[in-house]
């Protein structure tokens, strides 16, 4: 269903080209080839201890009181075989406290720690902390990556980036078979067999990041992908992307390599607020018209017209599917509509009526289509085309479409500028997360996870799971958040009073011009940012930098230049990689302006989820879970960029009167004179 971003390793929606985690196009060259990373300045590692504390055996630093509490609570939950859901503020050391607690429990119970991350890049911090822990106790870990990212043999093949994972697996197996048969094949696989012990010794001694391990292996003619599979069972900690437990097939292979049935592990889910969406995305999929047309083109190259079931042959079946998609678009969508709900079995009913098939007979026809696609794929591979047959891909998706007729999914017909498509969106991920729920001991941790009860309910966790909130230990006086009571981005208000827009723009410009600090301005959407851009470029007299939608390389270059300076303004949107995934320590960021409350625009999926939550948890719950909670998380993430160390000082101004409703959660107070309040804050001695 899904793939991985080649740049950050994140889970991606089917057939998307822009990664929602890092924002980069999957076809871009690696940015690191062009722009050197900025290293945080004036940062010191926590002070390490000379010898272990018997009460905190895997904690290598002098602990803050809150860290002791977190570790004890996690250990207690794990010892009782429970899940624990935690929101942990900046400065609590989420990575190290979770590792220390998990290793404490695992070492006493002969278990392994599985650490799930949203992106591969987040695994680097895990390896750094394992290095620190290893100075107290022997401990080792490894980061698992996909074949497409870490296999050097495949990277020698032209166009490997666009190949289907099944093709990559087939080519990999072919390379190994040829090597074992003495016919050449993959020399990296051969190198892995002869230098396995050396590689394992390096991993246990050096705790390499994913990139460091790849480089070590390739320099020695070893396959990093194969080595990871071979030695992961001997590691104390195994780090992997979410998909390794959301995908049944990948999970089975992962646990097989770990030699585990899932009962002998404890799990840490990092940035857990992303887990539910990742689970939904794992089960959601699209059937585009181009795929149907590709399958039709393939069918014309086949001898005759193969039967799918009795008198139903391939080409009429594919033509009926094409006509059905077209008819759905014409019948369900008005001139300006882009999407419309389909009935749970509307497509199946139409095809069954056309060919006089029962549901069982339609199932047989689709299985036959898949078999034809498998034969076609084998032929393509033998010819060296290295791709999956469109017939196979279409058949596999139709099988999933038939299986997604429950109320856990919403089906729709979509039309964009290019083509029509069918889409099945998972709105209830409880089946996908079942395996995770059954593990006896899982930590769900994030800096922005409130309300915890929402996460517990939607994930389907037991009511007796532990729920904890730990505030940041950093000085409260180092951060200030204010909001304005006379502006809002609410559509109805801005339409009724157009002067709101100009008032916001002038006040944003006024604050930017009078604060001699690096400033981030967060907008609720690209459309509002682009609408205000010409006025801000006219009125703000500083170096200005902009996030550009769909152009991550350009955006990251602008961000790089912004972080090098100390008096620029960077304009971005809430909820993107800059708002969540990048730290700005010290003077890299001191001031943030948040324009509006970023309620997500209503979609078919969000409306269906809202209805589902209202039915399951009570009236009003749906809007809260699908609109209010995501908006607040985005705002908290934006504000959280300000304070990354205990000496950072920062201030945020929210341009929306509706923030009064969330003032307690955001730690915000009403301001009648924002410029004076900002001036007073930054005039205080640090």
Regions found by a protein language model. Give the residues of each.
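A substrate-engagement module of RecA-like helicase motors
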Residues: 40-58, 62, 109-238, 246, ...
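Walker A/P-loop NTP-binding motif
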Residues: 73-76, 95-109, 128-132
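Walker A/P-loop
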Residues: 80-98
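A contiguous, basic/glycine-rich beta-loop/short-helix subdomain that forms a polymer-engagement track
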Residues: 211-235, 246-257, 365-488, 495-499, ...
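Conserved RecA-like P-loop NTPase helicase motor core
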Residues: 485-499, 549-658
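Conserved interdomain hinge at the start of the Helicase C-terminal
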Residues: 489-524
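Conserved helicase motor "Helicase C" RecA-like lobe of SF1/SF2 P-loop NTPases
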Residues: 524-548
């Amino acid at each position: 269903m899904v793939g991985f971003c080649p740049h950050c390793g994140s889970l991606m929606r089917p057939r998307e080209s822009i990664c929602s985690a890092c924002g980069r196009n999957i076809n871009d060259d690696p940015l690191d080839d062009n722009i050197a990373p900025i290293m945080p300045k004036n940062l010191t590692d926590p002070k390490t201890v000379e010898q272990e504390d018997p009460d905190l055996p895997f904690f290598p630093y002098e602990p803050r009181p809150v860290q002791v509490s977190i570790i004890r609570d996690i250990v207690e939950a794990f010892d009782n075989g429970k899940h624990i859901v935690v929101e942990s503020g900046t400065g609590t050391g989420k990575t190290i406290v979770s590792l220390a607690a998990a290793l404490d429990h695992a070492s006493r119970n002969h278990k392994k720690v599985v650490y799930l991350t949203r992106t591969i890049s987040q695994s680097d911090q895990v390896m750094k902390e394992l290095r620190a822990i290893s100075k107290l106790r022997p401990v080792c870990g490894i980061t698992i990556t996909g074949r497409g990212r870490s296999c050097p043999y495949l990277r020698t093949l032209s166009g490997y980036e666009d190949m289907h994972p099944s093709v990559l697996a087939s080519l990999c197996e072919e390379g190994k078979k040829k090597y074992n048969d003495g016919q050449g094949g993959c020399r990296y696989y051969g190198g892995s067999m002869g230098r396995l012990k050396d590689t394992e010794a390096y991993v246990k001694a050096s705790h390499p990041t994913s990139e460091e391990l790849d480089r070590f292996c390739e320099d020695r003619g070893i396959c990093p992908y194969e080595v990871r599979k071979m030695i992961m069972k001997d590691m104390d900690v195994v780090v992997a992307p979410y998909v390794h437990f959301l995908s049944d097939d990948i999970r089975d292979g992962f646990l097989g390599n770990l030699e585990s049935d899932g009962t002998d592990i404890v799990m840490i889910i990092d940035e857990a607020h992303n887990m539910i969406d990742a689970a939904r995305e794992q089960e959601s999929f699209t059937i585009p018209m181009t795929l149907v047309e590709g399958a039709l083109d393939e069918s014309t190259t086949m001898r005759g017209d193969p039967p799918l079931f009795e008198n139903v042959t391939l080409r009429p079946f594919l033509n009926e599917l094409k006509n059905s998609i077209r008819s759905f678009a014409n019948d369900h969508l008005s001139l300006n509509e882009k999407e419309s709900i389909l009935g749970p079995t509307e497509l199946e009913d139409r095809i069954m009526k056309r060919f006089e098939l029962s549901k069982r007979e339609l199932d047989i026809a689709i299985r036959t289509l898949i078999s034809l696609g498998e034969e076609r794929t084998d032929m393509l591979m033998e010819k060296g085309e290295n791709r999956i047959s469109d017939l196979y891909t279409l058949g596999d998706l139709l099988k999933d479409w038939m299986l997604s007729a429950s109320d856990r999914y919403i089906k729709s017909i979509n039309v964009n500028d290019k083509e029509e498509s069918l889409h099945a969106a998972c709105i209830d991920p409880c089946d996908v997360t079942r395996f995770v729920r059954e593990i006896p001991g899982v930590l769900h941790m994030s800096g922005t996870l409130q309300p915890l009860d929402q996460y517990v309910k939607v994930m389907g966790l037991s009511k007796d799971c532990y729920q904890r909130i730990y505030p940041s230990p950093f000085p409260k006086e180092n951060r200030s958040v204010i909001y304005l009571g006379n502006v809002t981005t609410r559509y109805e208000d801005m339409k009724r009073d157009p002067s709101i827009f100009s008032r916001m723009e002038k006040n944003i410009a006024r604050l930017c011009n009078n604060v001699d600090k690096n400033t981030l301005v967060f907008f609720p959407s690209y459309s509002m940012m682009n609408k205000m851009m010409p006025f801000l470029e006219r009125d703000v007299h500083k170096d200005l930098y902009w996030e550009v939608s769909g152009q991550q390389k350009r955006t990251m270059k602008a961000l790089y230049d912004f972080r090098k300076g100390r008096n620029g303004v960077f304009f971005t949107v809430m909820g993107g990689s800059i708002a969540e995934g990048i730290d700005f320590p010290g003077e890299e960021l001191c001031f943030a302006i948040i324009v509006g409350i970023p309620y997500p625009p209503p979609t078919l999926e969000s409306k269906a989820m809202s209805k589902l939550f209202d039915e399951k948890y009570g009236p009003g719950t749906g809007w809260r879970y699908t609109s209010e909670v995501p908006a607040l998380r985005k705002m908290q993430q934006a504000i959280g960029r300000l304070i990354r160390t205990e000496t950072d000082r920062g201030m945020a101004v929210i341009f929306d009167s509706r923030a009064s409703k969330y003032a307690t959660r955001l730690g915000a107070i009403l301001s009648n004179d924002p410029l004076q309040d900002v001036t007073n804050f930054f005039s205080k001695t640090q």
